[in-house]
Amino acid sequence: ESGFSTFGHSDDTINSSYKSWFSKDKFNEDNIYSNTQVKSLAISNGKATHVNVEHNGQSYSVAVEKVILASGSLNTPKILLNSGYKNKHLGQHLKLHPVSGVAGKFSDLQNPWAGSMQGIYSDDNLFRKDNYGYLLEGLPMHPSLFFPFFPNNQDNFADFISSYNYWSGSIVLTSDTSSGSIINKNPQHLWKYNLNNFDHGNLLHGIENLVKANFLAGAEEIMVATSPTMHWKRESNEDIESFIGKVRKVRNEPFRILLGSAHQMGTARIHPN
């Protein structure tokens, strides 16, 4: 049993990041700073000379020889913009690989938090239309990942919680044609992203296939991460095709489908063109 591997692993026998990269014989832990935010880089003659940071509310300027800026697609553009860099692509072209999920409840224990974090994978529809589509993947369902995607479940909440170990989850990971952007505000920047109808169609197609897969696997109940939550129960005698028909009619509207982001990409292009 690997436990809640989604949030790290306490077993010293595996090659975790602490063992591979941050072991005491390889890395000086005094060089890691918590409660610290990088605000900008000081640039002189085209070279970064200092990193301007805020640590516990105090501002500092740290002299550097080299800088590797690896703050992710959501934060790197703001640091570069605040450092004086200008590029028409900077902060644009945000891709998120939008994700939504389906869960199935089974009569046998699933223990969705245990074992391999991703044991199911299908790329049959990765290039569904115009070289864009989606992946189907297994989901490591820690409670903090599972319950927020189904906040409008109408069942008794205590019963829903107690049934957790019988649920199995999976996601649709969409290769998006949609694009977002970074809005550079101080002190906190914002992110803007709207899912277009093309990507919404691919997402719904993937959700439909996950519903079918759970049904064929014998699920007693199936939930779709919409708002309100769409919930099918075998005991209700609702025809599964009727339920799938309702899924197909879900419109591309704000907050109608609960979405996550698998990966954030594309906002720090270097080439000016």
Residue ranges and their predicted role:
Residues 1-40, 44, 221-257:
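Conserved redox-cofactor binding core of oxidoreductases
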Residues 34-36, 47-49, 60, 263-266, ...:
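Short beta-strand or tight-loop elements
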Residues 33, 68, 168-170:
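Hydrophobic/aromatic beta-strand patches that form the interior of the parallel beta-sheet core
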Residues 76-82, 213, 221-228:
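Extended, folded domain segments that form the structural surfaces/walls around functional sites
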Residues 24, 28, 70, 82, ...:
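Generic, well-ordered alpha-helical scaffold segments in large soluble proteins
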Residues 16-20, 33, 62-63, 71-78, ...:
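Generic recognition of stable, solvent-exposed alpha-helical segments in well-folded globular domains
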Residues 87-214, 221, 245, 253-267, ...:
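FAD cofactor-binding and catalytic pocket of flavoenzymes
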Residues 36, 41, 50-121:
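Glycine-rich loop(s) and the adjacent beta-strand/alpha-helix scaffold that form part
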